[in-house]
Amino acid sequence: MPSEAESSANSAPATPPPPPNFWGTMPEEEYYTSQGVRNSKSYFETPNGKLFTQSFLPLDGEIKGTVYMSHGYGSDTSWMFQKICMSFSSWGYAVFAADLLGHGRSDGIRCYMGDMEKVAATSLAFFKHVRCSDPYKDLPAFLFGESMGGLVTLLMYFQSEPETWTGLMFSAPLFVIPEDMKPSKAHLFAYGLLFGLADTWAAMPDNKMVGKAIKDPEKLKIIASNPQRYTGKPRVGTMRELLRKTQYVQENFGKVTIPVFTAHGTADGVTCPTSSKLLYEKASSADKTLKIYEGMYHSLIQGEPDENAEIVLKDMREWIDEKVKKYGSKTA
């Protein structure tokens, strides 16, 4: 005979499944239309695996330029990250985004990035395919990276011919790992003794980054409900590679010669504002902009209260619109 506790559990209503999208149950096409954009989804084949990709095009008006966006660690392009894509598209830009290898609906071991040059090259293959296509080849083109996607974006820039891109945009990029987020050298050394066998192990300490990234509690709930979000421990090879590649980009900031915009919040608990400050100080670009937002957390657009996110978006819009006017298209 079932106990009282078991009977209560059996009679309790089932937890409803999460909505199919961050905005709820409104059909996708209807929602995107309400935001003034047209969305399409597809897969892009590369030698390193298949990438899930999305485009966000303005419903009306002439396209000013193209923006190629990369998301952060454990995230993907199909949840709240779309808010960034849709914002730029509503300003008149054709936006293209891809789930990084090992993320979302792209191929690869979940959140394993033992070779970030390969991760960057794979997304770059898709971005350059679009960038060089007839509708877009003569338009201004910008790379955009958020958080760890900023690191991947900078690696893509280093892998590209100088004239490929009009400008770079970063939101809380990961170029410097905060001391309290750095992996233990003892752990990395111990796992290194296994000759690479431990590289894909999800065995590194987890600092629960999402709670340090999102200020707005309601948005935190929405982001935490993302079915594609990686929630396991960091993988050994990923953390080792992040240490290597953050050091690499710090040593090569001077190779950045095109216009750059970078932004950080002073209360960022995931990446530190030093990342943006160092890029701004060391980049060789004659045209560079640094924005530091007092009291804002890591996720400047997806996770801040709306009034804060609007401040950031306004600054980004003014910057990119000004660059398009200043540098124009290749045929201008």
From Swiss-Prot:
Belongs to the AB hydrolase superfamily. Monoacylglycerol lipase family. It is found in: Cell membrane. Interacts with ACBP2. The active site is at residues 147, 268, 298. Pfam families: Hydrolase_4 (PF12146). Residues 1-26 are annotated as: Disordered. Induction: By zinc and H(2)O(2). Esterase involved in the biosynthesis of lignin. Hydrolyzes caffeoylshikimate into caffeate and shikimate. Together with 4-coumarate--CoA ligase (4CL), acts on an alternative reaction for the formation of caffeoyl-CoA and bypasses the second reaction of shikimate O-hydroxycinnamoyltransferase (HST). Also accepts 4-coumaroylshikimate as substrate, but with lower activity. According to PubMed:20345607 and PubMed:22915575, possesses monoacylglycerol O-acyltransferase, monoacylglycerol lipase and lysophospholipase activities in vitro. One of its GO terms (molecular function) is 2-acylglycerol O-acyltransferase activity. Its EC number is 3.1.1.-. Its main location: membrane. GO terms for cellular component: endoplasmic reticulum; Golgi apparatus; nucleus; plasma membrane; plasmodesma. Disruption phenotype: Reduced height and weight of senescent plants due to reduced lignin content. Mutant plants exhibit increased sensitivity to zinc, cadmium and H(2)O(2). Residues 1-13 have a biased composition (Low complexity). GO terms for biological process: lignin biosynthetic process; response to cadmium ion; response to hydrogen peroxide; response to oxidative stress; response to zinc ion. This is Caffeoylshikimate esterase. Expressed in vasculature of roots and leaves, stems, flowers and siliques. Keywords: Cell membrane, Hydrolase, Lignin biosynthesis, Membrane. Disulfide bonds: none annotated. It catalyses: 5-O-[(E)-caffeoyl]-shikimate + H2O = shikimate + (E)-caffeate + H(+). InterPro entries: AB_hydrolase_fold (IPR029058), Hydrolase_4 (IPR022742), MAG_DAG_Lipase (IPR051044). It is an enzyme of class 3 (hydrolase). It is a peripheral membrane protein. It comes from the Eukaryota.
